[in-house]
Amino acid sequence: MEEIELYPHNQKAYDNLCAMLRDSNRACVVQPTGTGKFVIIAKMAQDNPGKDFLLLGTNDYMYIDQMANLSDIAPGFTPKNLQFMTYATAMAKARCGDEIPRCDVIVADEFHHCGAPEWGKGVQYVVENNPDAKIVGFSATPIRYSDTWRMRCLSETLQAAWSLRKHGLTVYFPCRSTS
């Protein structure tokens, strides 16, 4: 089995995460998309073979894809102590009162979904059934604005523009450069 070697930016995040978990039962890692957050999760599982991890994620495809990528990074390493469950499955188990796997560490990938009204109930159920588990969240963008909020802003902007045009004024919309 090959040892997972982290890139320097992930090693720093991993070291900080381990330090946080020594002092607290909850921690999070926020890094941009594509920078290797799943590799940090796998490293935690590899470095803690006596602990059971439950990874909550948005869909099976992402997990399967990440496991395939992991086989390129650490050939021969398949984390046997890492189970995967979608947020939707956790929600369904909460509704039915079904059994939740016991774990030492709950990992919430894309943890900004934990606050969603229905998926959040599933997360809470997992936590309640593993009261001593440490909880670790991973996300690229932990703050999300609801579609309602974005639509309201767009609607208000367009209404203001139409009102100004109605009175013969020219409307310019500010644009932010993405470069």
Locate each region found by the language model.
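Post-DEXD/H (motif II) to motif III coupling segment of the RecA-like Helicase ATP-binding lobe
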Residues: 113-173
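Short, conserved loop/helix-junction motifs that constitute active-site signature segments
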Residues: 48, 96-105, 124-132
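Conserved Walker A/P-loop ATP-binding site and its immediately adjacent core
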Residues: 33-34, 38-71
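Inter-Walker segment of RecA-like/P-loop motor cores
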Residues: 58-102
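Loop/turn-to-beta-strand initiation segments
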Residues: 52-53, 79-82, 103-105, 131-136
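Structural motif
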Residues: 28, 54-56, 84-86, 105-107
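Conserved pre-motif I regulatory segment
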Residues: 1-28
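Walker B catalytic acidic pair
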Residues: 109-111
